[in-house]
From Swiss-Prot:
Coiled coil regions, renumbered to chain: none
Cofactor: Zn(2+)
Organism: Arabidopsis thaliana
Protein origin, superkingdom: Eukaryota
Protein name per UniProt: Squamosa promoter-binding-like protein 15
Task performed by this protein: Trans-acting factor that binds specifically to the consensus nucleotide sequence 5'-TNCGTACAA-3'.
Annotated GO MF terms: DNA binding; DNA-binding transcription factor activity; zinc ion binding
InterPro entries: SBP-like, SBP_dom, SBP_sf
Length: 354
């Protein structure tokens, strides 16, 4: 019995030692112990190294096989070295090809144009995007371009028209300003040798009727100071007139039913200042001859302040001192530089300025 017990203890001690040794060499899950195989681990390391060597990027051009592990990611991704990516012709898979920088792959030589580094299809798309009009350019276009420059034969006429206006409007306004007036001043030549007949075509007399028409009320006020026969003056304005002639003399006066005459005042008395020769010449008699088709507003400014019939002086008749003084003041007003007519003593030139 003792021998059996000793042998059992020896067996149990041996089994425990083996279990401890087995536990030290592997893992025990339940009744199964998994041991690590040293040869298996070595084989796995070899497989990993083979895989790493097989995945190393190399240039796919025949005869190059350059390692691309230490170059830029672009070249290692597309498996082409820097030199062959810019070459005009390489051999890949037994064909003459070229690397396209837009597609990032090799194409046949027929797909390229001359020395272009991109294929024809990608260049067409690129040029189409660049030539497409930008929407912001329409904001900077000027509205002057809408006017056709060919209207005036000048490429800059559109800008000139928009800034200065239509040139045709200026020409139309100018033609209206140069239009001859419907009235005429014709002094008689035999009255004075230095006076010439004036034509009605001068453009300087064009605005006279408008000035007379606008100042008709002022002349009536001035007439009311000279005489009390204001209704007679209104009747004179209603008579049609279009011709002016000086009388045959400075002291004589011709009065008819269809004429209105303003005579020269009588000789100045000694207590009043004398009138200069120029003033006496400008105060000569003017006759207003009635016309057929003209209106009363075409009369000269002098005629509108002419004296009425009862204020005319001829053949030595005299007027009152106060009335004579007013008559002289009116004559001085029209003999100022801006109202008088410039006169030249030469018989060839006679300048009238309003």
């Amino acid at each position: 019995m003792e021998l059996l017990m000793c042998s059992g203890q020896a067996e149990s001690g041996g089994s425990s030692s083996t279990e401890s040794s087995s536990l030290s060499g592997g893992l025990r899950f339940g009744q199964k112990i998994y041991f690590e195989d040293g040869s298996g681990s070595r084989s796995k390391n070899r497989v990993n190294t083979v895989r790493k060597s097989s995945t190393t990027a190399r240039c796919q051009v025949e005869g190059c096989r350059m390692d691309l592990s230490n170059v830029k990611a672009y070249y290692s991704r597309h498996k082409v070295c820097c030199i062959h990516s810019k070459s005009s012709k390489v051999i890949v898979s037994g064909l003459h090809q070229r690397f396209c920088q837009q597609c990032s792959r090799f194409h046949q030589l027929s797909e390229f144009d001359l020395e272009k580094r991109s294929c024809r299809r990608r260049l067409a798309c690129h040029n189409e995007r660049r030539r497409k009009p930008q929407p912001t350019t329409a904001l900077f276009t000027s509205h002057y371009s809408r006017i056709a420059p060919s209207l005036y034969g000048n490429p800059n006429a559109a800008m000139i028209k928009s800034v200065l206006g239509d040139p045709t409007a200026w020409s139309t306004a100018r033609s209206v300003m140069q239009r001859p007036g419907p009235w005429q001043i014709n002094p008689v030549r035999e009255t004075h040798p230095h006076m010439n007949v004036l034509s009605h075509g001068s453009s300087s007399f064009t605005t006279c009727p408008e000035m007379i028409n606008n100042n008709s009320t002022d002349s009536s006020c001035a007439l009311s100071l000279l005489s009390n026969s204001y209704p007679i003056h209104q009747q004179q304005l209603q008579t049609p007139t279009n011709t002016w002639r000086p009388s045959s003399g400075f002291d004589s006066m011709i009065s008819f039913s269809d004429k209105v005459t303003m005579a020269q005042p009588p000789p100045i008395s000694t207590h009043q200042p004398p009138i200069s020769t120029h003033q006496q010449y400008l105060s000569q008699t003017w006759e207003v001859i009635a016309g057929e088709k003209s209106n009363s507003h075409y009369m000269s400014p002098v005629s509108q302040i002419s004296e009425p019939a009862d204020f005319q002086i001829s053949n030595g008749t005299t007027m009152g001192g106060f009335e004579l003084y007013l008559h002289q003041q009116v004559l001085k007003q029209y003999m100022e530089p801006e109202n008088t007519r410039a006169y030249d003593s030469s018989p060839q030139h006679f300048n009238w300025s309003l």
